[in-house]
């Protein structure tokens, strides 16, 4: 019948066999070799003899009989002795619960387990009860309800546990609460691994401080510091609050609320206690009630009406009292150690790097707890040759060759284990304690039983009547497990067994059960029935072998009935390490074997790896055999060559003999071939008429078809020739058409080019005429503008010349007046009778009095407004730079007194004199272009002159005075030139001249230019 997929489910036992329980979290399943058990035992554990005691059930007796058996040289099923590969003790609790132990195998199936080899770890075998119907499955194979599975997992609720423990502690009487605090405080002085005389004398843990906890000196120092703060700085209310904070620390430690991601539990608990103390404080109550009454929020009547609703604990009539010294000391110690632990935890978190996120949750408590036991065994120094490992196996010194190396890191591992243990909540610690006690009890019980006898064999099971079929392990190899089974057709199941044999099984040799390894259906398991054993004389009815296993791995073998898919039993077995040197080199064993079964996928992978290793080994052996065969063949060939050489090198007689034998053999073969050919010829001569007629018919058909083929070929050839002629004519027509098209295209291209040249020539000629006309018009406009500009410049230059002529005439008039004044001054000085000696006034320093100076002599003889040749000129303007006032009044520009500073030395220059002349060599350079016809092109103002590039025109007065000219000689020429007066845009100012005179009888002057000379240059 088809096997159900329920057999492939995992049958792992999620038990905390490591000494500590998980804090409400589900342990991650190790699909591949999960090393959660610390150090493991390999191969054979010990060579010493051990014993086993088997408790057999009996429905007729109330006590369990004890059957001593031997396992020094265990007997195989075929009767030959075989040395055991490891000590295997098999205590079997047939009607109860059996715990795993070291190097032992338990089969809980109302039967007896016999072990003869291999290391069989502690399995959890169970017997399934018979169902009412044959097709009813066992509860283990039935589908598991998720809600039922979730209800079996203990949830981790550290906040709820911490708050519940805190509420419980706050409700305890003072005496009981003091006792609880004392017990909690005493835990800090005990080593985590337990106190013993050996540990105290060897390691001094009480003084050095156990791993993960501070030392005794640190504790005393912190307690003293906190006690000093308690007595000096804390008042009564703060002391009572700190006392309740000690309760909070106890609750957080026991409830596990201060570790992991539950940091908010501390704040919540402290907040609850703080709010409770604030509400119960009499000072705060008086302050709040007084504030409410003063602000008229509530009235005294309302307060008295609702005050009875508050509990009596909150209505204080007197202030709090200080706690007793004993409770104060305990609270100080608890709070000091809490602060120290927080500081150490924060420092360790900052110092250690963050572990990588692997995505798998590992039972760290289990691993740490198991390692602690091993470390304690290392450090205890007790004179024992072995100790109990974390997974219940006896760990011997042979399994720890590097024990001294790991002993150096024992303190570090113990610190980690103690840190994990300190973070366990109270209920987890209780569960861990219970598991440890139960395991130690079962271990001691198993050791007491094995001390009374030897393991039993299959011969000891003869004559025993069992209620149901029994399966036991007979031999364990590195890659195979051999087992045997009893009869599965019991008396109470005769009807079902008969039905299976008749219908489901079909024959007596049909397998009554199948094997699943680690939850996976194992196809390489072979089961065969034992026929030679007489009925009633032996319990062995079935024998089987599970192959394809990996060495040094743990497996969980499930035996399931074929008819009902019920589990007969579940056995946990660990295969020993291989002893073959070649296989060890080819197969890579895990670095640390696991005693827990792997997942089905991992099991199959390991089996595949083992099979591949064996295949590679066989291939290597085959290659080695091939090489050996090649060597043998080469050796044989050498011998054959040697024999041939000896044969050829023999005498003539031998050669003749060999030749005659060869000829005889050839003659015989030729005769046989000749006889065979004669028989064939005889058969061919007698041809039947029917076959001859068929042959003639077929030949006629062939000739007819051949004629049709020839005619078809001729028709095909004629058709091909006709088509070829048509194709050739069409090709010639096509070639001629292509040539005509090419000629037409070339002609079209030539005509298009001519057309484009004509169009471009026409367009180019029209554009050239327009361009020339535009250029001519532009040149005419530029010439007109240039002519107008020159005309304006000539007119402006003429106006400037006229202005210069007028200015020169005015300057000559001023020079005449100055000369007359100087002459009069000299005459006056000569007529003055003043002292001329050096002791008196110096020459030229005798001031003239205004009364002595004749006014008529100082006035200008020229009229204020005169006319020359019909031209009217404006009166002389005084220079704006002249500072001395006129001697005759405001209308005169001459100096007022000849005694003062001579005014002719300070004559200001005209702005036209400062500017450079338009007639010099620099006149051709202009900032403004002639083509720029602005609004002021005819008027050359101050912007037309660049005074920065021309030296100012300075008039030399001495030259003017020394010049002997006739009046009107040059001026008349300049005035009679026919130029009309033009208003000048330049503003004229007083000119500045230079003169020189002496205190002699007269003076002389000279001028640097004349109007005639300037005019001549202009013309």
From Swiss-Prot:
Component of the regulatory network controlling carbon source utilization through ubiquitination and deubiquitination involving creA, creB, creC, creD and acrB. Involved in resistance to acriflavine, and required for normal growth on a range of sole carbon sources, including fructose, cellobiose, raffinose, and starch, and reduced utilization of amino acids, including GABA and beta-alanine, as sole carbon and nitrogen sources. The gene is acrB. Residues 992-1008 have a biased composition (Gly residues). Residues 602-788 form a coiled coil. This is Probable ubiquitination network signaling protein acrB. Residues 68-83, 102-117, 131-142 have a biased composition (Polar residues). Its main location: membrane. It is a multi-pass membrane protein. It is found in: Membrane. The keyword Glycoprotein does not apply. Keywords: Coiled coil, Membrane, Transmembrane, Transmembrane helix, Ubl conjugation pathway. The keyword DNA-binding does not apply. Residues 33-63 have a biased composition (Low complexity). Belongs to the acrB family.
């Amino acid at each position: 019948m088809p096997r159900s997929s329920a057999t492939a489910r995992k049958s792992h036992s999620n038990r905390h066999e490591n000494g500590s329980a998980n804090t409400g979290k589900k342990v991650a399943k190790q699909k591949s070799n999960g090393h959660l058990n610390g150090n493991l035992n390999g191969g054979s554990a010990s060579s010493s003899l051990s014993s086993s005691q088997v408790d057999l059930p009996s429905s007729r007796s109330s006590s369990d009989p004890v059957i001593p058996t031997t396992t020094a040289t265990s007997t195989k099923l075929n009767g030959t002795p075989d040395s055991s590969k490891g000590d295997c003790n098999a205590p079997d609790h047939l009607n109860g619960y059996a715990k795993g132990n070291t190097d032992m195998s338990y089969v809980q199936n109302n039967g007896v387990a016999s072990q003869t080899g291999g290391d069989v770890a502690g399995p959890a075998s169970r017997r399934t009860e018979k169902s009412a119907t044959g097709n009813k499955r066992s509860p283990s194979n039935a589908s598991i309800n998720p809600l039922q599975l979730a209800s079996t997992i203990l949830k981790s609720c550290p906040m709820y546990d911490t708050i519940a423990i805190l509420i419980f502690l706050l409700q305890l009487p003072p005496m009981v609460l003091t006792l609880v605090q004392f017990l909690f405080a005493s835990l800090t002085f005990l080593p985590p691994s337990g106190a013993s005389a050996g540990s105290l004398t060897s390691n001094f843990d009480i003084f050095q401080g156990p791993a993960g906890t501070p030392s005794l000196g640190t504790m005393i120092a912190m307690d003293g510091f906190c006690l000093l703060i308690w007595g000096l700085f804390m008042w009564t209310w703060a002391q009572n609050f700190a006392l309740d904070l000690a309760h909070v620390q106890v609750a957080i430690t026991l409830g596990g609320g201060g570790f992991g991601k539950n940091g908010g539990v501390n704040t919540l608990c402290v907040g609850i206690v703080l709010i409770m103390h604030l509400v119960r404080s009499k000072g705060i109550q008086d302050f709040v009630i007084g504030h409410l009454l003063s602000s008229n929020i509530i009235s005294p009547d309302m307060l008295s009406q609702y005050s009875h609703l508050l509990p009596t604990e909150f209505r204080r009539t007197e202030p709090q009292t200080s706690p007793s010294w004993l409770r104060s000391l305990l609270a100080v110690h608890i709070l000091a150690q809490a602060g120290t632990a927080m500081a150490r935890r924060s420092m360790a978190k900052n110092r250690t790097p963050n572990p990588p996120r692997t995505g798998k949750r590992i039972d760290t408590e289990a691993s740490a707890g198991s390692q602690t036991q091993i470390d304690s065994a290392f450090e205890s120094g007790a004179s024992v040759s072995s100790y109990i490992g974390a997974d219940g196996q006896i760990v011997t010194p042979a399994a720890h060759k590097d024990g001294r190396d790991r002993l150096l890191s024992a303190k570090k591992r113990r610190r980690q284990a103690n840190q994990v243990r300190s973070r366990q909540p109270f209920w987890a610690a209780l569960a861990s304690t219970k598991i440890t006690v139960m395991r130690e009890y079962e271990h001691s019980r198993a050791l007491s039983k094995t001390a009374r006898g030897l393991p039993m064999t299959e011969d000891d099971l003869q004559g025993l009547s069992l209620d149901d079929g029994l399966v036991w392990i007979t031999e364990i190899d590195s890659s195979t497990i051999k087992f045997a089974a009893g009869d599965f057709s019991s008396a109470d199941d005769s009807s079902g067994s008969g039905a299976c044999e008749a219908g489901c099984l079909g024959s007596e040799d049909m397998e009554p059960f199948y094997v699943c390894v680690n939850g996976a259906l194992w196809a390489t398991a072979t089961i065969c029935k034992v026929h030679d054993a007489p009925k009633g004389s032996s319990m062995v009815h079935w024998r089987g072998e599970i192959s394809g296993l990996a060495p040094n791995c743990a497996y969980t073998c499930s035996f399931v009935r074929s008819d009902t898919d019920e589990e007969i039993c579940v056995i946990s077995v660990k295969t020993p390490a291989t002893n073959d040197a070649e296989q060890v080199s080819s197969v890579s064993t895990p670095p640390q074997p696991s005693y827990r079964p792997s997942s089905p996928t991992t099991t199959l992978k390991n089996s595949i790896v083992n099979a591949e290793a064996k295949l590679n080994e066989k291939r290597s052996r085959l290659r080695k055999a091939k090489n050996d065969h090649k060597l043998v063949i080469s050796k044989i060939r050498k011998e054959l060559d040697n024999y041939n050489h000896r044969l050829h090198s023999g005498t003539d007689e031998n050669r003749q003999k060999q030749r005659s034998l060869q000829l005889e053999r050839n003659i015989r073969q030729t005769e046989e071939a000749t006889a065979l050919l004669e028989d064939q010829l005889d058969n061919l001569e007698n041809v039947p008429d029917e076959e001859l007629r068929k042959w003639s018919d077929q030949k006629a058909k062939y000739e007819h078809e051949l004629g049709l083929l020839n005619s078809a070929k001729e028709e095909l050839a004629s058709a091909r020739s006709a088509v070829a002629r048509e194709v050739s004519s069409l090709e010639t027509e096509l070639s001629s058409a292509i040539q005509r098209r090419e000629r037409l295209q070339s002609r079209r291209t030539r005509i298009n080019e001519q057309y484009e040249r004509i169009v471009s020539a026409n367009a180019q000629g029209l554009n050239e005429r327009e361009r020339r006309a535009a250029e001519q018009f532009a040149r005419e406009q530029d010439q007109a503008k240039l002519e107008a500009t020159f005309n304006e410049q000539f007119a402006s230059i003429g106006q400037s010349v006229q202005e210069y002529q007028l200015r020169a005439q005015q300057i000559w008039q001023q020079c005449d007046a100055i000369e007359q004044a100087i002459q009069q001054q000299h005459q006056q000085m000569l007529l003055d009778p003043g002292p001329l000696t050096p002791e008196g006034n110096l020459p030229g320093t005798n001031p003239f009095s205004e009364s002595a100076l004749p006014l008529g002599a100082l006035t200008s003889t020229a009229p204020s407004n005169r006319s020359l040749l019909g031209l009217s000129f404006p009166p002389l303007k005084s220079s704006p730079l002249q500072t001395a006032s006129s001697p005759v009044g405001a209308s005169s520009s001459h100096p007022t007194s000849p005694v003062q500073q001579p005014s002719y030395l300070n004559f200001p220059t005209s702005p036209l004199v400062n500017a450079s002349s338009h007639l010099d060599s620099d006149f051709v350079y202009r900032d403004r272009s002639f083509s720029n016809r602005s609004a002021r092109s005819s008027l050359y103002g101050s912007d037309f002159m660049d005074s920065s590039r021309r030296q100012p025109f300075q008039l030399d007065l001495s030259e003017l005075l020394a010049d002997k000219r006739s009046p009107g000689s040059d001026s008349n020429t300049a005035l009679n030139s026919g130029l009309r007066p033009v208003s000048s845009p330049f503003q004229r100012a007083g000119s500045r001249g230079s003169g020189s005179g002496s205190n002699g009888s007269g003076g002389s002057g000279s001028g640097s230019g004349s109007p005639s000379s300037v005019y001549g240059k202009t013309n």
